[in-house]
């Protein structure tokens, strides 16, 4: 079944993860993936030359909250069977970013023209995967309701370095009432494969965020007077780290534009 638009600006509907990936591969969908195929886990991408892969793997092990590994490809491989059938790492994400020397060099709809045989792909857990659990728990998510990407911010919290990889932790933010924030901690603490429990609640200044209305990535999301900002470690962290490290080459997903896998969110607590 192919994609069709949702009502009132809602996310499009796909039959399953394979259907979504095929629509993305064919260029029929290029938007952010929050709320798409909600039963399935989504992943952030970090694609590096083989020479840098070992240091990055160690970086992920030392920083499991922002960089929980769901899968790692063989050098040059565009398939990753552990995460999905009929999955192509070079075409099945709605948007890619290419960084050279720490600077954004290109934004591409696919990587077919730049793929190399020495590239290794890391797929990292994404907070979009726990959003279905939050919604099932009765916790409203404003960015989903508004059809926006989640708001993401650089913080003053430094990651643990490994080789050339170092830099600030990036967080995603969801506004919630206090009672919902408590439930959100309980729900997401059971899902360490997709960032786990929040790293901070409340005053954003305590983690170096000056203005919630001006996210570094994603879209601003309004906060009501009776709500708290709740912050989770975010898989955009590797992009900030790559920029800080001025790596010769790395390729990532565009923020909010994830790889939709065949993994089910309900199975993530057991990975």
Swiss-Prot record:
Keywords of the record, alphabetical order, are: Lyase
Q: Which InterPro entries match?
A: D-Glu_cyclase (IPR009906), Putative_hydro-lyase (IPR038021), UPF0317 (IPR016938)
Q: Which residues form a coiled coil?
A: none
- What Enzyme Commission number(s) appear in the record? 4.2.1.-
Query: Which EC class is this protein assigned?
Result: lyase
Give the record's family classification. Answer: Belongs to the D-glutamate cyclase family.
Protein name per its UniProtKB record: Putative hydro-lyase Mrad2831_3350
